[in-house]
């Protein structure tokens, strides 16, 4: 998959993506991932402003939340259309003084950013679109400030795609194929996306000189609720249930998305709250 092809997908799909984030499933993905992230954020210090980087920031939904916490945030994306939406959203939120917009390719972080510059790095729903996710993680590792800095990665979970095909779509052939597939088809942008397992994630983090300190599941059951349950009206209850499921080892492995938190490999390994 070429970088240009990916850029075109994001550029042409920017408005559709913004609309998706307003739907319950889009809100849940963003809200749950951010709630998980808050458990691992470095402590804010009055005398020091933390610096964050959002790789593949999209419309800036998560980055702007970090800016509201007082962080200085660099928003990096390959799509000018996405960055335009992020800029407008930042203006509406009144945080333009806290953000820097940067057009660039996630696989070229080492040439775009100074080393040891960021306390928090996000890479949410980016790696599944790329042929070389290790290049992104190597660049992110280089950009982490020190052993206390945190990297949050959100990816599409292979097990979740099996359940989606079988339960939501009722397509047993695709479900069976997804049991071993490295790639699947997605509908938002159109085209293929990489599927990850816990083992494959551990391997690419290790290759990037990073150590995973925790894994969380994002959207474990919400996608499969019957029609009588309104995702809009019952949003808060669904959110709270998902939060409880996200760290439970018997449930999280079948979530639609897997969220990993990592530090530089020399850091001590300890789970969060």
Question: Language-model segments: which ranges?
Answer:
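Conserved class I S-adenosyl-L-methionine
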Residues: 1-56, 61, 65, 85, 150-179, ...
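Short alpha-helix
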Residues: 192-209, 215
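A C-terminal cap/extension of S-adenosyl-L-methionine-dependent methyltransferases
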Residues: 214-270
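A conserved beta-strand element that flanks and buttresses the S-adenosyl-L-methionine
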Residues: 122
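Class I SAM-dependent methyltransferase SAM/SAH-binding core
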Residues: 53, 61-108
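A short glycine-rich, Lys/Arg-flanked "PGG" loop and its adjoining helix->strand segment in the class I
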Residues: 134-150
């Amino acid at each position: 998959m070429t970088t240009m092809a990916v850029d075109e997908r994001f550029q042409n799909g920017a408005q559709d993506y913004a609309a998706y984030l307003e739907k319950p499933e889009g809100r849940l993905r963003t809200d749950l991932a951010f709630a998980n992230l808050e458990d691992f954020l470095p402590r804010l210090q009055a005398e020091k402003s933390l610096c964050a980087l959002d790789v593949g920031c999209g419309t800036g939904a998560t980055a702007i939340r970090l800016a509201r916490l007082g962080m200085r945030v660099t928003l990096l994306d390959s799509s000018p259309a996405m960055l335009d939406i992020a800029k407008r959203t930042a203006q509406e939120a009144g945080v333009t003084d806290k953000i820097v917009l940067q057009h660039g390719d996630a696989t070229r972080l080492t040439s775009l950013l100074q080393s040891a510059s960021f306390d928090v790095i996000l890479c949410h729903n980016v790696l599944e679109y790329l042929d070389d996710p290790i290049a992104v993680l190597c660049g992110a590792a280089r950009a982490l400030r020190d052993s206390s800095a945190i990297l949050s990665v959100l990816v599409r979970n292979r097990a979740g795609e099996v359940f989606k095909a079988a339960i939501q779509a009722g397509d047993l052939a695709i479900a069976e194929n997804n049991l071993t597939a490295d790639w699947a088809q997605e509908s938002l942008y159109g085209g293929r996306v990489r599927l990850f397992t816990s083992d494959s994630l551990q391997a690419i983090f290790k290759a990037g000189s990073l150590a995973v300190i925790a894994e969380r599941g994002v959207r474990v059951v919400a996608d499969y609720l019957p029609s009588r349950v309104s995702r809009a009206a019952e949003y808060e209850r669904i959110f709270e249930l998902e939060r409880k499921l996200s760290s439970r080892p018997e449930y999280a492995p079948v979530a639609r998305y897997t969220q990993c938190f990592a530090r530089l490999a020399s850091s001590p390994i300890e789970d969060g709250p």
